[in-house]
A protein has these predicted regions:
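Short amphipathic alpha-helical leader/targeting segments
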Residues: 33-34, 155, 248
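Aromatic-rich carbohydrate-recognition surfaces in CAZymes
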Residues: 47, 54-75, 131-245
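Catalytic cores of carbohydrate-active enzymes
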Residues: 95-105, 116-117, 123, 140, ...
């Protein structure tokens, strides 16, 4: 009572002969208008000064909802086929069914929690978390799917973390915030100096895992200095006579 409730419905009228079957397809689509920041005139509280843009990656290709829907409709069969293509090798394997489902379902990280902006910077939101995004410890369990299938996206987030390495050599806990903005290479993250002990070790482990999966030594060497600084930070947290860093996690 006293509240305005909004809703919508889609209905289609048709006829069916006895025993006849028809398939009716609906497309649900929404469009994010591109939020453009006037960095010379907009108040500073409107955006994160040192961060990336507030657009979406599809803004590079589509300029209206109509264009986006037309593309989705015209390419629907190809998109369906190519989605099934990467799943086929899993479904046809000898893995147990529960594990097949788990592997395919790991893709949820991309379509429920990922931000990919117009520039191509990527980060993942761990959950509610008050808007905090790009959690390094969350990556340990969430990254294998997109590291394997979308290595460039995985590296985007890893590179922002590396660029945001703090003065002690520690990798930060977060690199973005839904209500402020996200970091970018060469910029600043809105969550500086926030870290837990496993963030730095987790970043190093994932960098090594990338090399193990891709064999890309050039990419690994690019961050050799960051790895060294991270290891020095972890050593600084090892009590005398103990080879394990001690701290909050």
């Amino acid at each position: 009572p006293g509240k305005t409730l909004g809703g919508s419905a889609v209905a289609l009228k048709g006829r069916l002969q006895p025993g006849e079957k028809k398939t009716v397809r609906f497309m649900l689509a929404w469009y994010y208008p591109e939020l453009e920041i006037d960095r010379e005139n907009d108040p500073l509280e409107f955006y994160w000064v040192g961060g990336s843009d507030y657009g979406r990656y599809f803004h590079n290709f589509f300029h209206s909802l109509r264009q986006l829907v037309r593309y989705g409709f015209a390419e629907r069969q190809r998109l369906r086929n190519q989605t099934f293509e990467w799943q086929r090798s899993i479904l046809e394997s000898t893995l147990p069914d529960w594990y097949k489902f788990k592997l395919i379902n790991s893709g949820y990280v991309i379509y429920t929690n990922m931000i990919l902006n117009k520039k191509g910077d990527m980060t993942v939101n761990e959950g509610g978390m008050g808007g905090l995004a790009g959690t390094m410890d969350q990556r340990l369990s969430a990254h294998p799917f997109y590291q394997k299938f979308f290595t460039r996206l995985d590296r985007s987030e890893m590179m922002i973390f590396a660029d945001a390495q703090q003065t002690r050599g520690n990798i930060p806990h977060f690199i973005g915030h839904y209500y402020f903005g996200m970091g970018t290479v060469g910029g600043r993250v809105p969550t500086e100096e926030g870290w837990m002990i496993d963030n730095t070790g987790g970043w190093i482990i994932q960098l090594a895992k990338d090399y193990e999966q891709t064999g890309d030594l050039k990419y690994l060497k690019r961050y050799a200095g960051r790895v060294y600084n991270g290891m020095e930070f972890l050593r600084s947290l090892m009590p005398e006579g103990v080879n394990i860093p001690v701290g909050g996690t």
